[in-house]
């Protein structure tokens, strides 16, 4: 638990450095701009598609028969937003992971772990594959759990759990791939998966805090890099794996 809090705290101190501040806001702003632009051009098409999807359900027929057509219309808007919100999150996190993580890892390693040997256990293809798996699983779980969103069941919990999964799955590979060997990478995943998920939950909470949510993608990259490199250093100090 201490190493999780330590990584979380160091992420906040690191993000204040000018090099990191320059990276912070634009992933979320770029994601918002992209999806709002797409919504501007395709909102009518998306609404028609969602309306047709809902119209085929038994619940929609029952609501319309009993004079609750407005509920159906609001359900269309709600479902579209519930699909749009994770797309914005995925896009912002992907921008940070793909374009900014090399800079983040280099910054953290130079300032905090200058003597840590690079054993390059990861590959470019491995990073791409990891990102694809993370996004597909996250999107699939979000879609599968949509009925729970509409019923209100687990609404406070689901976003945290899903965002935590995306955070830890996406950032852990890039945080470790340059410095950890393949054996060290596997050892860290086996022994620290729970702590990485906890770190993912703590970072997911930032998306609910105004202004901090703009920094969340870069803070996530910093936190997982601090956590990962500290674990690599600890393994080598103990002569493991």
Listing of model-derived features with the role each one plays in the protein:
Residues 1-138, 142, 182-183, 187, ...:
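Helix-coil boundary and N-terminal low-complexity module in membrane systems
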């Amino acid at each position: 638990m201490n190493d999780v809090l330590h990584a979380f705290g160091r992420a906040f101190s690191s993000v204040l450095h000018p090099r990191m501040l320059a990276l912070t806001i634009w992933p979320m702003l770029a994601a918002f701009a992209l999806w709002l632009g797409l919504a501007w051009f395709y909102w009518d098409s998306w609404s028609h598609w969602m309306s047709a999807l809902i119209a085929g359900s038994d619940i929609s027929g029952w609501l319309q028969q009993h004079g609750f057509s407005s509920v159906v219309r609001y359900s269309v808007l709600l479902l579209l937003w519930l699909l749009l919100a994770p797309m914005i999150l995925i896009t912002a996190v992907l921008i940070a992971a793909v374009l900014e993580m090399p800079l983040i890892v280099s910054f953290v390693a130079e300032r905090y772990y200058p003597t840590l040997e690079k054993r390059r256990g990861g590959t470019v293809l491995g990073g791409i594959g990891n990102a694809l798996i993370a996004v597909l699983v996250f999107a699939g779980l979000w879609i599968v759990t949509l009925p729970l969103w509409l019923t209100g069941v687990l609404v406070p919990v689901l976003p945290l759990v899903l965002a935590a999964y995306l955070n830890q799955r996406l950032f852990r590979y890039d945080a470790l791939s340059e410095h950890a060997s393949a054996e060290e990478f596997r050892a860290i995943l086996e022994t620290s998966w729970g702590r990485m998920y906890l770190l993912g939950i703590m970072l997911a909470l930032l998306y609910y805090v105004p202004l901090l949510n703009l920094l969340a993608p870069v803070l996530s990259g910093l936190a997982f890099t601090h956590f990962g490199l500290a674990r690599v250093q600890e393994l080598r100090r103990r002569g493991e794996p």
